[in-house]
């Protein structure tokens, strides 16, 4: 989706040039967060082309009922993707999340991925974690998707009540234990009858999403 470049944006870019979040090279006025080379190099999953049966969706089979699922990039430690996510989560760059959300929306819209989805729920952080970081990276991604698609965000529907550290260094069983009963449904009326897009920044075993989804599915006639 093309976006207008204002005179103010051009002026700011002259004095405060923007850099690619991965390689650090200067961005052109038409580029956002990623330079063209890094955008092409980041490994896309292609799951959006088969959203009903892919490696991601299979993580949830037998655990929760899920209509479809997709992710934009593969994630590996010490990769370009991991550097991008690290800056988003720990580098105080919430704008990366919103830009990634817009990128996801633009690319997924080509496949009509969002057809029928009526609400977006980002995986929440605990209040303490939110205070420490200053923002929820999943919420920022959700904002970007919402800005392009017009799908509303239900920020208060789900609350995170426990957090026992990052999932990335844990094994499968530790991940499941780490997020067991980690969430609480706080506004069941707002999600009744909704087809929800559940957003997280990184998916490893899928344990976090399963825990969050189990709470959301307590709502009446909810689909994910």
Show the residue positions of the predicted features:
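Glycine-rich phosphate/pyrophosphate-handling loop used in enzymes and phosphotransfer proteins
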Residues: 1-224
